[in-house]
Amino acid sequence: MDKKNGGFDLESEIRRLDVSKEFKIEDNLKKKVVKVVAKKDSASSVTKSADLSGVKDSNGVIFSDFDYDIPSSGLENNIKTLEQSNIIKFFNGKDYVEIEKLYDKPITEVRKIVEGLGTNHTIAVTMKKTELIFLLVKILSENNIDVLFTGVLDVLSDGYGFLRTASNSYLSGGNDVYVSPSQIRLFNLRTGDILYGQIRSPRDGERFFAMVKIKSINDQDPTFAQNRIPFDNLTPLYPNVKLNLEYENCNISTRLINLFSPIGKGQRALIVSPPKAGKTTLLQKIANAITTNYSDVILMILLIDERPEEVTDMIRSVKGEVIASNFDEQASRHVQVAEMVIEKAKRLVENKKDVVILLDSITRLARAYNQTMPTSGKILSGGVDSNALHKPKRFFGSARNIEEGGSLTIIATALVDTGSKMDEVIFEEFKSTGNMELILDRSLADRRLFPAINIKKSGTRKEELLLSEEERSKILLIRRILGGVDDYEGVEVLIEKMKKSKNNEIFLKTMSNGN
């Protein structure tokens, strides 16, 4: 019994793992022996061996068949070079490396690191990034260097779990880390928990890295997770703290939202948009405003059924975490990504964090659930199963302000005027579930008036909790003026006047003076 690792026998837990339940393993696997020469002292070197299998699963090759020697000469100097380049760090008398940061590096850089430790170039160029990192962990472990890993826990029905990474959109892959049932029970772990701890490379007959020591859970001491209140038992309140989207030299879009559809912490906001009305650009503006004004708010952008080029553009345009499932992926993949994101957000809120999820779009997520849910035999108009909208509603309904501390804000886009009866039914189901609506107008976008926001139809429930009495009275006056004019003319004049003022405070003062 290993008392240092929480009173459980890690080795027996690993061996109990039936990996065939998670992956389809091909028959006739060939095993090769990798000879790793690790320098143990200045006088001699010892040759060690371990088995790596040419295993394939539904996600591709995990480990290739290869056989080579790593020379002990120069290994110690190359490790010192990694220390100088800040890849290997030193803390509390011990060398360590945070392995998940290697996944963010280009494969060429990872290959260069592995080659620097003695791997032949002709072999390294044939290996995938996962294989290179696997080998690197093995070499570093042999040289008494701790390997640390951060990932989001996905607990499976059999009681054990795996740590998924954001670089793989929290989906299963060869870089996952096994977490034993004993660890999950000991620390009361749930899907979505962010674990940080020491891992080791697979041993004989194993296929995954394994967590051997948990150092933190959701950036807090592991013991905190044992006594936390579950998300569903927390007390929801109306949003009462405004998320200010205005900053110096900001876009008119966020200034308009700040006045006519204010967003609070815990808001359940719906951006209703026809095609080509600028919803993606608007989401980028909102994301940049949040990251600029609130460094403590955790921002996640979830893109479902999206075009790959738009995913790249979003990653490069905003500072938050972007999780995406492209339109060429299966519907089940869309669902899995979305569920991992919402579970991660819930765990953070349980730790009194303020989280914002920007979802594009709730319509596509509902379509994915409609394809993956077992049929109930009750089909609504448009081909929507009556049970299919339950889970996307639970996703959207998770947004709330928490009395005990923390909040989950969800700003989701809903597609309309697409020509699809299904999209129309989905929008009607979600129309009354939010507490803030921002309506984008296709007629304004066609006339190249951006932001194409229909001020008359947009608004926030309980906006008196987010705006001062003075602001409300002046905004009410503007709404009355806009109510008597054409939509295009009213928005055009409003935008022109706002552009002449530096910020909303100055703009409201000019309006009160009759200008």
Swiss-Prot record:
Recorded superkingdom: Bacteria
Binding sites annotated in the UniProt record for ATP: G264, K265, G266, Q267, R268, A269, K276, A277, G278, K279, T280, T281, R307
Keyword ATP-binding found: yes
The entry's keywords: ATP-binding, Helicase, Hydrolase, Nucleotide-binding, RNA-binding, Transcription, Transcription regulation, Transcription termination
EC number(s) from the headed UniProt entry: 3.6.4.-
Pfam families named among the record's database cross-references: ATP-synt_ab (PF00006), Rho_RNA_bind (PF07497)
Any one biological process term the GO annotation gives: DNA-templated transcription termination
Record domain Rho RNA-BD: where: 146-221
GO MF annotations in UniProt: ATP binding; ATP hydrolysis activity; ATP-dependent activity, acting on RNA; helicase activity; RNA binding
The protein's assembly and partners: Homohexamer. The homohexamer assembles into an open ring structure.
Biological role stated in the UniProt entry: Facilitates transcription termination by a mechanism that involves Rho binding to the nascent RNA, activation of Rho's RNA-dependent ATPase activity, and release of the mRNA from the DNA template.
UniProt-recorded name of the protein: Transcription termination factor Rho
Species, as recorded: Borreliella burgdorferi (strain ATCC 35210 / DSM 4680 / CIP 102532 / B31)
Gene designation per UniProt: rho
